[in-house]
């Protein structure tokens, strides 16, 4: 006698027990993934998802969630993906969910994958959304193969990786979402954590889940300067007039004797020499 499991029984809550950094090996290359841009801000998180997918030898296609649904369905149908990835901000979540339902209606065999801070903050509340096939809690790293290997209605837990392993795939994004490529101000980040505990932010969720030691080691460590310069050189190929330094706290660790003091001094000099675009910082 078979047993039918309800979605809330299949989706399980995240444990976030740190079991080591994410594996950067790929066991299932060659699949097709669509990434959905929503809203008017640069989807800086999703471009790292794109980077991880390309590094694992998958094919990607960007679509603009602001475009007509019929137009997007045609593009998706032609590309024939196995998965569609959404990483909306909380303010864009309902829009992304509406789009996922419309796509699911036309293409029921395509798997919708939702991740990002909104999922991280309220995974329990999203279990019963029928248009969502996979929820990804935490970083993308280590999650791609898990998505491919897991049954539907699974909550996937990602794992952190060192910033030196993290590089966004911006060219495809700016070319395929031209209204973002044409923006005069682009984003860049040197680390992905925050030392504060604002009540409206999910930073505290991540820090508590993984622990302060792991959080500092992976989220607060600076990216290699050469990686950031490589990223910024691509910005020069597009219509970029200025760059926003989007770290939650650019000056973290730059007090006298701090770990990042020398890093920031060196970054400033290299940026001036090789990029020389105005920067704005948080």
Where are these regions (language model features)?
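Residue-level signal for short, function-critical loop segments
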Residues: 37-40, 90, 192, 249
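Glycine-rich beta-alpha loop elements in corrinoid/cobalamin-binding modules
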Residues: 38-39, 49-53, 61-167
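N-terminal [4Fe-4S]-dependent radical SAM core
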Residues: 3-29, 149-191
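Radical SAM [4Fe-4S] cluster-binding motif and immediate context
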Residues: 171-282
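Alpha-helical structural signal in soluble globular domains
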Residues: 52-56, 102, 106, 129-131, ...
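Radical SAM enzyme core and accessory elements
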Residues: 1-36, 54-57, 62, 69-82, ...
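Conserved alpha-helical elements of sugar-nucleotide-dependent glycosyltransferases
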Residues: 41-48, 227, 263
């Amino acid at each position: 006698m078979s047993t039918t499991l309800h979605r809330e029984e299949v989706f399980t809550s995240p444990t976030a027990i740190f079991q080591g950094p994410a594996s950067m090996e790929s066991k299932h290359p060659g699949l097709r993934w669509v990434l959905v841009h929503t809203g008017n801000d640069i989807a800086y998180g999703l471009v790292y998802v794109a980077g991880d997918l390309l590094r694992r030898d998958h094919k990607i296609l960007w679509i603009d969630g602001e475009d007509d649904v019929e137009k997007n369905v045609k593009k998706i149908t032609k590309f024939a993906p196995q998965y569609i990835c959404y990483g909306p901000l909380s303010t864009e979540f309902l829009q992304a969910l509406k789009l996922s339902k419309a796509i699911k209606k036309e293409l029921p065999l395509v798997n919708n994958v939702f991740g990002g801070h909104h999922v991280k903050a309220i995974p329990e509340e999203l279990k019963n959304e029928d248009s969502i096939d996979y929820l990804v809690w935490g970083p993308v790293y280590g999650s791609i193969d898990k998505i491919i290997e897991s049954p539907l209605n699974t909550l996937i837990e990602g794992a952190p990786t060192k910033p030196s392993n993290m590089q966004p795939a911006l060219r495809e994004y700016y070319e395929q979402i031209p209204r973002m490529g044409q923006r005069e101000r682009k984003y860049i980040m040197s680390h992905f954590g925050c030392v504060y505990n604002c009540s409206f932010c999910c930073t505290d969720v991540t820090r508590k889940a993984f622990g302060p030691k792991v959080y500092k080691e992976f989220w607060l460590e600076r990216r290699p300067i050469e990686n950031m310069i490589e990223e910024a050189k691509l910005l020069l190929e597009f219509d970029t007039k200025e760059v926003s330094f989007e770290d939650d706290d650019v000056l973290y660790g730059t007090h006298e004797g701090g770990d990042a003091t020398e890093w920031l001094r060196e970054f400033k000099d290299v940026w001036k020499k090789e990029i020389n675009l105005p920067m704005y910082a948080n």
